[in-house]
Amino acid sequence: MHVFGDIWQNHAERIAANWDAVVKPEDTVLVCGDHSWAIKFEDAAADLDYIAARPGSKILIRGNHDYWWRRESTNRIQSQLPESMRLLHGRGLVIEGVGVAGTRGWRVEFDQDLDAGDEKVMKRELMYLERGLSEIPAEVESRIVMLHYPPFDADLEPNAFAQILRSHKVDILVYGHIHGGFKMEGDVDGIDYRLVSVDHTGFAPVRIV
């Protein structure tokens, strides 16, 4: 990662030190994608072992660089991970009264119109988000959504993902992908937007709830 700038020097060591210093075994950590550069699951072992070695339970969603995690292989990969790591792909779950749904989303930073391939992926990701949120029972204390891509375009205009967040009365959105440049944080239409890309958070976990 250091090829992307000096800020990334020793990033793995810094993340580990900061994570280990504040996360307790009973905590749950939401990790919003781009876990490994590997193409195949077998080649991602070292990166996944690194995440597994950190304290706490972890919930992972796919990022745009996670080629090792193909959507149709989610169950197979999950079966080979430790119990402390949960792959969340278009599903919803409840942790200590808090509902969590997650999916990758789709690209937003390009000015050109989406082509047919983009439209297909976009519709699928929207369906995953809708499904995941629908699996969260009504009586939860709050609803958190994990996305890799943010739910707005390069002009900071909300897209169809944001509409789903509003319709399901999501309380908190955590997202990644953005490294500098455009971003939205804080109260957006009653939803607390949190950008959690590690270079934005100082390579340290941030408390969500």
What is each of the regions a protein language model found here?
Residues 36-42, 64-72, 94, 107-111, ...:
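Active-site environment of divalent metal-dependent phosphoester hydrolases
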Residues 13-17, 94-96, 117-123, 134, ...:
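Binuclear metal-dependent phosphoesterase catalytic core
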Residues 49-55, 81, 163-169, 187-188:
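Short, conserved loop/helix-junction motifs that constitute active-site signature segments
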Residues 42-49, 74-78, 156-166:
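Charged helix-capping and loop-helix junction motifs
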Residues 22, 66-156:
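Conserved catalytic scaffold of divalent metal-dependent phosphoesterases
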Residues 1-57, 67-68, 122-141:
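N-terminal active-site segment of His-dependent metallophosphoesterases
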